[in-house]
C-alpha cells in the first residue's frame, strides 16, 4: 500500500508556539515537488507530544488539505492511552488521512498481551489502514516479533515501522511480509533494510534531503545496491547529525536553514545548541541540501 521514502514531517511553529499554517502548506508542496512518497503528519518528528488533541487533529486536516490528493498522508495517532489513540485515529480518518501511524505506548510499559489488545482495539474501532511503530529506545517498551506476527492477521494493520536493529527487520520480513509491510524507522539502516526486504523508510532525513532519500530508497527497492550505497554515503553524515540532540531539535533547525520554516520548537524541547550548528550545516552541504 505504501512504499519508498516517507517523511516524518516537522510541524512548523511561530515564535509564540502557534502552528505556522503557511509554512506547513509550503512544506507539503516542497515534498510533493522533491520526490517524497508519503507524508507522516504529527508523528514524533512533528512534535506530537506537545500538541493538544485539537491541534493534533487540526494539523492532520491541514496537511491533507495542502496535499490535495497529490501524495498520501499518514496521521500520527499513537498514544499511551488506548482510548486517546482511538479518538486520534478516528479524527485522522474523518480528516481524510490515508492511514495512521501508531507508536507503541510509552512510559506505562504494557505487557505483550496488553500491546496486542491495544492495537487490536484501535484496529477494531477505526477501519482506516494502520501502521505500527516500534521504537524501544524512546518508548522503553519493545513490540516483539511474536506479537507483531499475531497483529499481522488483522486486516487493517498493514505495516510496521521498525526502529530497533537490522536483525529485527530481517526477522519481521521473514515472518510477516506476506501480511504486512515492514518499514525502516532508522535512516542510517534504511538502505540495508530495504535491500533486506523492507518496503521503504519513514524518515527524519527526508525533511532535509527528500529527493536524495527518495532516490536512495528507489535504488534499493529495485535491487541496485551500488547506486543505493553511493547515495547513502553522501547522506551518512546527515543521518548522524540529525540526532546530535533529541529529535526533532536538529531537523527543525536544519529545515529552517533551508528557508522552509522557522526554527521555533515547543518546550520542553529547545532550539539546537549553537555548538552543533556547523556540524549539521556541513552534513547538509555534503548531502546536497545547502
Curated annotation (Swiss-Prot):
Sorted UniProt keywords: Amino-acid biosynthesis, Cytoplasm, Diaminopimelate biosynthesis, Lyase, Lysine biosynthesis, Schiff base
PROSITE patterns given in the database record: DHDPS_1 (PS00665), DHDPS_2 (PS00666)
Annotated residues for binding of pyruvate: 45, 202
Catalytic activity field: L-aspartate 4-semialdehyde + pyruvate = (2S,4S)-4-hydroxy-2,3,4,5-tetrahydrodipicolinate + H2O + H(+)
GO biological process: diaminopimelate biosynthetic process; lysine biosynthetic process via diaminopimelate
Top EC group: lyase
Pathways involved: Amino-acid biosynthesis; L-lysine biosynthesis via DAP pathway; (S)-tetrahydrodipicolinate from L-aspartate: step 3/4
Localization, UniProt: Cytoplasm
Cytoplasm is among the record's keywords: yes
Main location: cytoplasm
InterPro entries named in the record: Aldolase_TIM, DapA, DapA-like, Schiff_base-form_aldolases_AS, Schiff_base-form_aldolases_CS
Function: Catalyzes the condensation of (S)-aspartate-beta-semialdehyde [(S)-ASA] and pyruvate to 4-hydroxy-tetrahydrodipicolinate (HTPA).
Protein name per the record: 4-hydroxy-tetrahydrodipicolinate synthase
Species whose genome carries this gene: Alkalilimnicola ehrlichii (strain ATCC BAA-1101 / DSM 17681 / MLHE-1)
Originating gene: dapA
Amino acid at each position: 500500500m505504501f512504499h519508498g521514502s516517507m517523511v516524518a514531517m516537522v510541524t512548523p511553529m511561530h515564535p509564540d508556539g502557534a502552528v505556522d499554517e503557511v509554512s506547513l502548506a509550503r512544506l507539503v508542496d516542497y515534498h510533493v515537488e522533491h520526490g517524497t512518497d508519503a507524508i507522516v503528519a504529527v508523528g514524533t518528528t512533528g512534535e506530537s507530544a506537545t500538541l493538544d488533541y485539537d491541534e493534533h487533529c487540526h494539523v492532520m486536516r491541514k496537511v491533507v488539505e495542502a496535499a490535495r490528493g497529490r501524495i498520501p498522508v499518514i496521521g500520527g495517532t499513537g498514544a499511551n492511552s488506548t482510548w486517546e489513540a482511538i479518538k486520534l485515529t478516528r479524527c485522522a480518518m474523518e480528516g481524510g488521512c490515508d492511514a495512521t501511524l501508531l507508536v507503541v505506548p510509552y512510559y506505562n510499559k504494557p505487557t505483550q498481551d496488553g500491546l496486542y489488545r491495544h492495537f487490536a482495539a484501535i484496529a477494531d474501532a477505526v477501519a482506516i489502514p494502520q501502521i505500527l511503530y516500534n521504537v524501544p529506545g524512546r518508548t522503553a517498551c519493545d513490540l516483539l516479533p511474536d506479537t507483531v506476527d499475531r497483529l499481522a492477521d488483522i486486516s487493517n494493520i498493514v505495516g510496521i515501522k521498525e526502529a530497533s536493529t537490522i536483525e529485527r527487520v530481517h526477522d519481521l520480513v521473514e515472518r510477516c511480509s506476506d501480511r504486512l509491510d515492514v518499514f525502516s524507522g532508522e535512516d542510517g539502516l534504511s538502505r540495508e533494510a530495504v535491500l533486506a526486504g523492507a518496503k521503504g523508510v519513514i524518515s527524519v532525513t527526508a525533511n532535509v534531503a527528500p529527493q536524495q532519500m527518495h532516490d536512495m530508497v528507489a535504488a534499493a527497492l529495485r535491487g541496485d545496491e551500488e547506486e543505493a550505497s553511493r547515495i547513502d554515503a553522501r547522506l551518512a553524515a546527515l543521518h548522524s547529525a540529525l540526532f546530535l540532540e533529541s529529535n526533532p531539535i536538529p531537523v527543525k533547525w536544519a529545515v529552517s536553514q533551508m528557508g522552509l520554516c522557522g526554527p521555533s520548537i515547543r518546550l520542553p524541547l529547545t532550539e539546537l545548541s549553537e555548538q552543533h550548528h556547523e556540524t549539521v550545516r556541513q552534513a547538509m552541504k555534503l548531502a546536497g541540501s545547502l
